[in-house]
């Protein structure tokens, strides 16, 4: 992985990271280098939440970008998932607010969406509340297109979408990059 424009790169750890890792029957997706932290600590039998207790929001003052993480666990044709956001306390970097949302026995065709910011501002205001309910309809290409077209044009960079067959564990993935 490399930056689209290396001249704008200040802290590579905030830009270059593995956003997706698979550990057995668990798929881990994040917006930062905490992907590896979750993977490594869960591989040592720690939980998703325990792994995230070792991390905080990004150190990119004044925004202190929230770290968003998700994990999907598939077992014997059933699945559950959890999402987390680690963010500063209303822009105060001395405190980290930690929220985890867990979903057991999810309904087919339904999901949840969590994002980093709640619009524009200086500093950018962090996401608030519970993840938004979303309808997951159509095939992977239709869904990918719908999500990409609904992201803010000025702020979107990349999108990763994966459809996983719960019965077999087989999957299809799509990646969209604003800068090709």
Map each language-model feature to its residues:
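Conserved short alpha-helical segments that host acidic/polar catalytic motifs at enzyme active sites
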Residues: 1-180
């Amino acid at each position: 992985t490399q930056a689209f424009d290396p001249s704008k790169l200040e802290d590579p750890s905030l830009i270059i990271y593995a956003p997706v890792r698979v550990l057995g029957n668990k798929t881990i997706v994040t917006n930062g280098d905490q992907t590896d932290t979750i993977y490594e600590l869960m591989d040592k039998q720690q939980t998703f939440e325990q792994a995230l207790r070792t991390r905080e929001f990004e150190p990119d003052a004044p925004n202190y970008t929230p770290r968003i993480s998700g994990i999907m666990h598939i077992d014997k044709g059933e699945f559950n998932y959890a999402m987390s956001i680690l963010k500063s306390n209303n822009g105060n970097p001395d405190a980290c607010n930690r929220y985890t949302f867990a979903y057991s026995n999810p309904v087919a065709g339904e999901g949840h969406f969590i994002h980093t910011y709640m619009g524009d501002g200086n500093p950018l205001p962090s996401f608030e509340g519970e993840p938004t309910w979303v309808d997951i309809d159509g095939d992977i290409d239709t869904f990918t297109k719908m999500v990409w077209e609904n992201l803010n044009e000025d702020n979107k960079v990349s999108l990763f979408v994966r459809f996983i067959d719960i019965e077999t564990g087989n999957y299809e993935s799509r990646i969209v990059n604003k800068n090709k």
